[in-house]
């Protein structure tokens, strides 16, 4: 069964404390920014969702306001697990000021871990971290 929904309806389903994994190619390419914008808009209007954990393996953003910059609100984001923060200056500021928990792992390790989680396997051992 195929189900099509709006970005706003999708954003409304995200609960406080949720973990969200996003993907893209960095530099504002191949990113579902319309959905990310709807999540941010909901937070700015209602204060929810809050205390999120955000996971991404590649830098996602445009060095301005898109991508992970949309999650760069202290109350919205509790922690980020990422390959790097190059494309998100607002996220860099939260990390630099210890406003949120931040973990930086190799992008390939994050991608492999997400694959293992999606397959229902227990985890991942790697030589690099």
Task: Give names to the regions the model predicted.
Residues 1-129:
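Conserved alpha/beta enzyme-core scaffold
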């Amino acid at each position: 069964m195929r189900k099509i929904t709006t970005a706003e309806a999708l954003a409304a389903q995200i609960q406080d404390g949720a973990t969200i994994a996003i993907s893209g190619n960095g530099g504002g390419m191949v990113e579902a920014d319309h959905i990310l914008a709807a999540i941010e808009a909901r937070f700015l209007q209602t204060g929810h969702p809050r205390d999120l954990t955000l996971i991404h393996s590649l830098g996602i953003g445009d060095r301005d306001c898109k991508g992970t910059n949309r999650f760069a609100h202290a109350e919205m984001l509790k922690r980020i697990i990422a390959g790097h923060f190059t494309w998100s200056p607002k996220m860099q500021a939260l990390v630099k000021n210890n406003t949120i928990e931040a973990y930086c792992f190799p992008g390939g390790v994050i991608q492999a871990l997400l694959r293992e989680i999606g397959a229902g396997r227990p985890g991942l051992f790697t030589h690099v971290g």
